[in-house]
Swiss-Prot record:
Localization in the cell: Cell membrane
Name under which the protein is recorded: Elongation factor 4
Record key words, sorted: Cell membrane, GTP-binding, Hydrolase, Membrane, Nucleotide-binding, Protein biosynthesis
Family: Belongs to the TRAFAC class translation factor GTPase superfamily. Classic translation factor GTPase family. LepA subfamily.
Binding-site residues, GTP: 16-21, 133-136
Its membrane topology: Peripheral membrane protein
GO CC field: plasma membrane
Entry's Gene Ontology BP terms: positive regulation of translation
């Protein structure tokens, strides 16, 4: 099929706005799959994706479409994740397309992550087709959403297509708009090969299978190729396209979206966003879009049963074959045994990895409190990267600490501006500006407002998103983007049990929250640690300064039970002997901290 009859497009949307359902309708209405072959969320092949209703990895499928004027077109649809953690996956998918369908929920309107993805599409010069979905729902407010689209994105009513992806309403008109408005791929088949990798997965028989878009030249089975960013070389074992299963083809031409089987042993050798070219006589200039995805959130993962460490290690190795953005290295803790310090793109990424480890590999896990990567400069001038609180130098050895900051966009009804501003202020946010989303965007909750802040990444890591939803009754949405490192005033708080620090309870906090967090930690531990035969002292400390304390009183054995009446000095002697014994026990005794205590402390944010 000619290059002029090819259309490459993606679907971008906020999470749960109906992106995967629309992909299903496009597949069904173009006859790519028969009705009996269809299942809900065809593009979401991972069980976890279907269950949570989210897209985690980018997918691609080739559709054949016969337009109303009887011309046949090849439509390459690339599905993208909608969650902020996977924004890098969205960016490289967008780089592989000429057009984007922007899906907006008729009941919710424009959300923060919708805007982030739109700006990305504009940056890559994509033709955007705005679509209002879920028009069949009773809560649909089409005039309001249309007003938002016009005021925020600048599209007239005529350019917006109204659909119900669930019922298929308006989808035929959308297909016509795709062939009419999305430009054909440019590229030159005579130039040296350049193809952009937008995803990959590991196949036990074919090695790494790279999903790519051919920008110039073509790919044939048996070609010797090279990755321009990493320098990795491989031979094409198989090339083909997705329908949605892999279908082998003789070659991939300029503008095509398909796959190549590389025979490589790990997705780390075939990074997403890299440019593929020929080993001999290849291109000189790579395509845009490659920068390695960087882990932003770190947490320790340990098996509940220490015997399961080897199973956990094997599971981590298998998961990392398909997820180049997951980093891990072994670490050990006196309380939790052997485990791994892992790096993730964000909290959802962490959540998904833990759920996959537990579900697919049948492991029971303990996950430590998530933190960020800090840059610490010692007084000696040495610069350290600290991802584990226990790696933090002593306070007098630290010259400065830098932490990652993010630019945050919150969209909320104006009714909740005050509560949102209070929440952000409590979490060390710095206000930048406010924008109103158009005069027509009115409802009983007031006009919708876009608030811009800079915030430390650690502030939004734990319960910030839940608190935002709770304080705005679920109406607010959030998007954030890494903007760099800034000087931070942070300290490590330790928990001491009978003067011995327990490493698993250490965390890095702002000093002004030390008393509040310290009190909460020792109070929770006091509830969870069983009483011993001697007094147990729990302390929270920053360096040598104690900021909170609680005591667990000793169990007392009745040593004078057998003394009936008689001389009081005999009783005193027995009680003094008991007191001496307890003093000695406290010096040499080891308090067993149960894992339940650790888990309950973890839930304290």
């Amino acid at each position: 099929m000619s290059q002029s009859a090819t259309r490459n497009f993606c679907i971008i949307a906020h999470i749960d706005h109906g992106k995967s359902t629309l992909a299903d309708r496009l597949i069904e209405m173009t006859g790519t799959l028969r009705h009996d072959e269809m299942c809900e969320q065809v593009m979401d092949s991972m069980e976890l994706e279907r269950e949570r209703g989210i897209t985690i990895k980018a997918k691609a499928i080739r559709l054949r479409y016969l337009s109303k004027d009887s011309h046949e077109y090849r439509l390459n649809l690339i599905d993208t994740p909608g969650h902020v953690d996977f924004s890098y996956e969205v960016s490289r998918t967008i780089a592989a397309c000429e057009g984007a369908i922007l899906v907006i929920d008729a009941t919710q309107g424009i959300q923060a992550q919708t805007l982030a993805n739109v700006y990305l599409a504009i940056e890559y010069n994509l033709e955007i087709i705005p679509v209002i979905n879920k028009i069949d729902l009773p809560g649909a407010d089409i005039p309001r959403v249309m007003g938002e689209i016009k005021s925020v994105l600048g599209y007239d009513e005529d350019a917006v297509i109204q659909i119900s992806a669930k019922l298929g309403l308006g989808v035929p008109e959308l297909l016509e708009a795709i062939v009419a408005r999305v430009p054909a791929p440019k590229g030159d088949g005579k130039l040296p090969l350049r193809a952009l990798i937008f995803d990959s997965h590991y196949d036990p028989y074919k090695g790494v299978v790279a999903y790519l878009r051919v920008a110039d030249g073509n790919i044939n089975k048996g070609d010797d190729l090279r990755l321009m960013g990493q320098g990795t070389e491989f031979k094409v074992l198989e090339a083909g396209y997705f329908a949605p299963a892999q279908v082998a083809a003789l070659r991939l031409d300029v503008g095509d979206v398909g796959y190549v089987a590389t025979g490589l042993k790990s997705v780390g050798e075939c990074r997403v966003g890299d440019t593929v070219t020929l080993q001999h006589g290849g291109a000189i200039q790579p395509l845009i879009g490659y920068h390695p995805a960087k882990a932003m959130v770190f947490a320790g993962i340990y098996p509940t049963q220490t015997d399961d460490y080897h199973e956990l290690r094997e599971a981590m190795e298998k998961l990392s074959l398909n997820d180049a953005s997951l980093s891990y290295e072994p670490e050990s803790s006196p309380l939790l045994g052997h485990g791994f310090r892992c790096g993730f793109l964000g909290l959802l990424h962490l959540d998904i990895i833990v759920e996959r480890l537990e579900r697919e590999f049948n492991l029971s896990l303990v996950v430590t409190s998530p933190g960020v990567s800090l840059t610490v400069t010692r007084t000696s001038g040495e610069v350290l990267t600290v991802v584990n609180p226990n790696e933090m130098p002593l306070p007098h050895e630290i010259a400065s600490i830098e932490e990652p900051w993010v630019s945050v966009v919150i969209i909320t009804p104006s009714k909740y501006i005050g509560t949102v501003m209070d929440l952000v202020r409590e979490n060390y946010g710095v206000y930048k500006n406010t924008e109103y989303l158009g005069q027509l965007a009115m409802s009983e909750l007031g006009q919708r407002v876009q608030l811009h802040y800079d915030m430390p990444l650690r502030s939004i890591l734990t319960t910030f998103h839940d608190q935002l939803k709770s304080r705005t009754q679920g109406y607010a949405s959030l998007d954030y983007e890494f903007v760099g490192y800034r000087i931070a005033n942070l300290s490590k708080i330790d928990v001491l049990v009978n003067d011995v620090a327990v490493d698993a309870f250490s965390r890095i906090i702002p000093p002004d929250k030390a008393h509040e967090i310290g009190e909460a930690l020792v109070k929770k531990l006091k509830e969870m640690i069983p009483r011993q035969l001697y007094q147990v002292t729990l302390q929270a400390a920053i360096g040598s300064k104690i900021v909170a304390r609680a005591d667990i009183s000793a169990k007392r054995k009745d040593v004078i039970a057998k003394c009936y009446g008689g001389d009081i000095t005999r009783k005193r002697k027995l009680l003094d002997k008991q007191k001496e014994g307890k003093k000695k026990m406290r010096q040499i005794g080891k308090v067993e901290v149960p894992k339940e205590a650790f888990l309950s402390v973890l839930k304290l944010q």
